[in-house]
Amino acid sequence: MSRIRKPEVHVRGQQPPGGVERARLRASAAAFTSLVALAATGLVAGPAVGAPSAGPCALPRTSAHHSLGLDTWNGAYPQPVRTLDAVMVFLSFPDSTPLTAPAELAADHFPGTSDFFRRASYGRFALRAHAQPEWTVMPKDSTDYAIRRDWAAGKRTEYLRDAVAAADRKVDFSRYDIVYLVADPDAPGVDSDATKVVNLEHPVTADGKDIKRVVTVFERHPPDRNVLAHETGHVFDLPDLYHRPMDGKGDWDTHVGDWDVMGSQFGLAPEPFGWHKWKLGWLERSQVVCVQGPGSRLFSLEPLAAAPVAGGTLGNRLAVVRTGPGTALAIEARGATGNDRDTCKEGVLIYRVRNEAASGEGPIEVVDAHPRTEACWDRSVYPPLADAPLGVGETLTVADDGTRVEVADRTAAGAWTVKVTVPPPSL
């Protein structure tokens, strides 16, 4: 697609012991003054807290940024297994009169983003947005901040400092888990490619609340599809799955194509991978088939994006073969329902997971079951992977480890019968 992906930014800062209370938030300028941009490979580390699940197929979490290890949860991030409240602050500038009302901009993203996560989490997570009804006026012209995708650290610091100070006059930050700073899309200095999550190595405390990260939104009106779902995924410790070419040119979607919103917000099948759902706590261990070899195992997989039957159990949504200390093969069924309603092809999708690969460095790679063909060239972000899933009667032996995946049948209810054979370990 034509839009350039927007990696996260990590920012260092210093703040006085005890943070900045509401009555003293003007001191937030001092807290931000020394902020310096940190390379995108930096970490916002946190304590390990309650594991989403464990077992022989759960890879351990590593120090990689947004590691896909899931034996423990990174306590620096809110886990989306309850209701989380988000504030939307709308920022205007002296050099431009907004052409769009805050309510219209809020409607660009909500309830759509909340609905996306409600479906993806099977109702386990609710994102509740609180949109400020009026514009918050920034102290400087939009052009003064030099907003762009690869933003100069000093200018980004200035923007964040001014935004927090201006918003604090109206916002009680202690009430919110997530902060969205939404800029006037028609201001002359606003660049829509600058939308991203900004992580603060040293949180700024307002109203007794540590602000560890903010989502800076510079989208057009109307915005890119699912853009806020993608950015909010970072707030929950999910990595970028796209591949950024070294020269900034070429295709960004070679790792996962249309599959998962963290690969492309434009994708035809944006439902989060089953591995992501397992990490976030949306899948229980009982809904993950751990295939241990050598030998074969036959089981059924329900479509990942299918809503649970009222009064029924969720059923198997993911199968995993552990292939190494930090690697695994994941297998899931994808169907044209829910967030995947526009998918190019239904079937059983296979992908590799690496727990030591950082965000944007290939933590997930889809295995193409049809490497000589492509599909949906007029709609797909990466047609070579649009037909990656296996169909009924098809078999794939995965290179490197030799695991064989066979799709034996599909039931009338839509579940896929899958046989996985794990070879003996090589000598």
Region annotations inferred by a language model:
Residues 3-4, 18-51:
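Secretory targeting and sorting signals
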Residues 3-6, 59-70, 201-203, 207-218, ...:
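Non-catalytic C-terminal accessory/binding modules of secreted extracellular proteins
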Residues 49-221, 229, 247, 406:
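Zn2+-dependent metallopeptidase catalytic core
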Residues 89-94, 182-186, 238-241, 264-267, ...:
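Active-site-proximal beta-strand/loop segments in catalytic clefts of secreted hydrolases
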Residues 95-101, 269-274, 339-341, 359:
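Short, solvent-exposed loop/turn elements at domain surfaces
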Residues 99-111, 272-279, 345, 365:
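Short, polar loop/linker segments at the starts of domains and inter-domain junctions
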Residues 173, 178, 186-340:
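Extracellular hydrolytic enzyme modules, especially secreted metalloproteases
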